């Protein structure tokens, strides 16, 4: 993060920090925001946009289409343009505003709902952590697939070895047709030339994830034959 901030300062470019997975950490490591590092470095001339959303994290309320952006060190003319963009909306997203309020103002210790909030939040994060291990271990058990440990967020990005002349888009499409499993080709994420990957998620239930791994195992063994 420090290197990115220093690079942005040198090149006079803004930083757009997508920090929606700050609660989804499955190892003993604290989340560190760009804003915190920026403050620690006492740098006040690097523009920073920090994003959060109710669609991600442990809430996963995608349908509400609600989030927020915190900005720092923004020139006045940019603020004016942002206000113009905000003003063109015909009406406010009332349900989304309610949900984003709950995100930034969760129950506090002493509140009647606090114990239930902690129980539900920790239960969701514990389940995601378990499913992250199920998926990464399962994919690594398949010959020709290697997957880094999933230490945060909700996704895996395994490397796949496929026959010469094949590509990850073809792999993903055939997997969808033959098994009903939908994954995303790694070529859409700027993967290194000459390598092949796909992206998938840890969101399905635990037993469903095990079933997904078994289907991918059979498919991968037969792919290209």
PLM region spans:
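PLP-dependent class I/II
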Residues: 1-225
């Amino acid at each position: 993060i420090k290197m990115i901030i220093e690079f942005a300062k040198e090149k006079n470019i803004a930083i757009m920090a997508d920090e929606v997975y700050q609660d989804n950490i499955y190892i003993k490591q604290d989340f560190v925001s760009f804003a915190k590092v920026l403050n620690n470095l006492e740098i006040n001339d690097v523009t920073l946009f920090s994003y959060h959303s109710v669609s991600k994290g442990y809430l996963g309320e995608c349908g509400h289409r609600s989030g927020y952006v915190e900005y720092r060190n923004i020139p006045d003319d940019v603020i004016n343009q942002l206000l113009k963009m905000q003003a063109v909306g015909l009406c406010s997203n009332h349900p989304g505003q309610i949900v984003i309020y709950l995100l930034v103002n969760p129950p506090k210790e002493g509140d009647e709902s606090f114990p239930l909030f902690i129980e539900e939040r920790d239960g969701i994060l514990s389940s995601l952590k378990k499913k992250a291990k199920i998926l990464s271990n399962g994919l690594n058990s398949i010959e020709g697939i290697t997957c880094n440990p999933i230490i945060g967020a909700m996704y895996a990005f395994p490397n796949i070895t496929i026959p010469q002349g094949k590509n990850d888009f073809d792999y993903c499409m055939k997997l969808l047709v033959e098994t009903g499993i939908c994954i995303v080709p790694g070529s859409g994420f700027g993967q290194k030339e000459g390598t092949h990957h796909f992206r998938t998620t840890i969101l399905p239930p635990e037993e469903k994830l095990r079933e997904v791994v078994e289907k991918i195992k059979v498919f991968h063994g037969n792919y290209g034959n």
